[in-house]
Amino acid sequence: GRADWEKGEIKLYCNQVFVSDSIKEVVPRYLLPLRGVIDSPDIPLNVSRSALQTDRRVRSIGNFVAKKVSDRLRNLKKEDPKGYAEAWDALAPFVKIGAMEDEKFAEQVSELILFATTAAAREREDGDPIACDGRAFTTLEGYRSRLAADQKKRVLYSTDDVAQAGALNL
């Protein structure tokens, strides 16, 4: 089902005692669609929004969750690049929003963000580009590594790759 952005689908516990299911103050906004349980002795039993927002221990839980998400995405891409590319359309909005909102998360996922490419999907040592369902995906670093020495270092971004296909194949 759809994630409830207001309520969240992560339950907070302190030493196995239910505290809250209002997690907006604990995890970053871009991770609210996650489902699960956080059980930590660092979560205060007396929960108020202002207490959660100002508690340094609670903020560190949000950073920890973001780090675990980026680690899991990195492992998925490394272990199953094609599976990662297949899931990318569903993951992309959250990863990209997270990268825009959280500088630390952006550094953690910079090599995990995929872009569609017109490059032929031929297997290289680094596995770039990744072929998936007739499409090819690359990372920004993968694109840069394929540039010829005499080629200008430029990156083309398209908002509508079908309508702009002629220009992109230049």
Feature locations, PLM:
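Conserved GHKL (Bergerat-fold) ATPase module
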Residues: 1-170
